[in-house]
């Protein structure tokens, strides 16, 4: 059975997508969150939308540009840091399940940076570390809902559901998979964890069933930082696959009402992770290089 996170009806919510083992960006997001706690008098929340783990193990000289800013995978350390942060701020730091986390608790094993990323990370962590990581993953929700209208998932809102109860009834065990490919056709979790896109009709149907108006998710890499799809969907890239200047996180007022994704404005709700590097189009402060 899966869990659905129900966010409070007031406070500031910060949203971070797809770190994939990038400790530097995790630490920067923690810094932003702790600044928000001060700014909003302790009433702030931080949500990670899955895929905190499974990054590259590549030397700098072999690093391809399409992976964005260089880093080395620190998945094990990041998960421990995430759990520590959640313990430090009870009820204010949350994580959603991504397809990469799911591989460690019954889902198909991913193979982006290794033939079997699940086996590799568990080998690195050892039995005790693996058990601890799995315990952390089991605390993660499949989706988050809010009264401000935003519904949060790892992947696109393409799943067919009739209510939030269908999300809560989803089987995460993987017991029915004959092969890893079966996940793609598995009701609810197949789409929520793996879908990179949803049609306008699919998104509207999902949001109506979940009681929301807009869908915010990651999973796919948006090199420009974010992409609005119609009135209902926005894909956000906070870390993985991007250069620092294009990394974006979301900052929302949980007491507000967001009717369309166009209510999310650059410089207000859509903010650069590294403002000193980001261009003006993302609300950044980077200085243009003058040609002499």
Segments predicted by a language model, with ranges:
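N-terminal active-site segment of His-dependent metallophosphoesterases
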Residues: 1-73
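Beta-strand-turn-beta hairpins that frame and shape the catalytic cleft
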Residues: 5-14, 145-151, 231
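Active-site neighborhood of phospho(di)ester-bond hydrolases with catalytic His/Asp-centered motifs
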Residues: 15-17, 46-51, 94-99, 152-153, ...
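Active-site environment of divalent metal-dependent phosphoester hydrolases
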Residues: 22-24, 54-57, 100-106, 145, ...
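Active-site neighborhood of divalent metal-dependent phosphoester bond hydrolases
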Residues: 42-44, 52-151, 158
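Conserved beta-sheet core of the metallophosphoesterase superfamily
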Residues: 111, 116-123, 197-258
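Active-site-proximal loop/helix segment associated with metal-binding centers of metalloenzymes
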Residues: 111-210, 243, 287, 291
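A short C-terminal boundary segment appended to hydrolase-like catalytic domains
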Residues: 269-292
């Amino acid at each position: 059975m899966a869990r659905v996170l129900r966010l409070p009806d007031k406070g500031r919510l910060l949203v971070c997508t797809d770190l994939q083992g990038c400790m530097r960006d995790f630490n920067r997001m923690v810094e932003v969150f702790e600044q928000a706690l001060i700014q909003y008098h302790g009433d702030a929340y931080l949500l990670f939308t899955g895929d905190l783990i499974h990054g590259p193990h590549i030397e700098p000289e072999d690093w391809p540009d399409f992976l964005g800013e260089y880093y080395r995978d620190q998945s094990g350390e990041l998960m421990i840091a995430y759990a520590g942060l959640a313990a430090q701020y009870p009820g204010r730091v949350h994580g959603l399940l991504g397809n990469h986390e799911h591989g460690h608790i019954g889902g198909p094993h991913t193979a982006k940076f290794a033939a079997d990323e699940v086996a590799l990370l568990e080998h690195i962590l050892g039995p005790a570390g693996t058990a601890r990581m799995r315990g952390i993953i089991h605390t993660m929700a499949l989706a988050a809902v809010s009264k401000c209208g935003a519904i949060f998932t790892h992947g696109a809102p393409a799943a067919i559901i009739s209510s939030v109860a269908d999300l809560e009834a989803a089987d995460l065990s993987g017991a029915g998979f004959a092969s890893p490919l079966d996940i793609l056709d598995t009701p609810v979790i197949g789409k929520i964890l793996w879908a990179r896109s949803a049609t306008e009709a699919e998104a509207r149907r999902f949001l109506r069933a979940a009681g929301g108006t807009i869908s915010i998710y990651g999973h796919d890499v948006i090199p420009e930082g974010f992409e609005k799809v119609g009135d209902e969907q926005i894909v956000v890239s906070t870390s993985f696959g991007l250069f620092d200047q294009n990394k974006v996180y979301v900052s929302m007022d949980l007491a507000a009402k967001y009717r369309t994704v166009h209510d999310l404005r650059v410089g207000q709700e859509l903010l650069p992770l590294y403002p000193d590097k980001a261009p003006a189009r993302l609300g950044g402060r980077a200085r243009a290089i003058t040609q002499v």
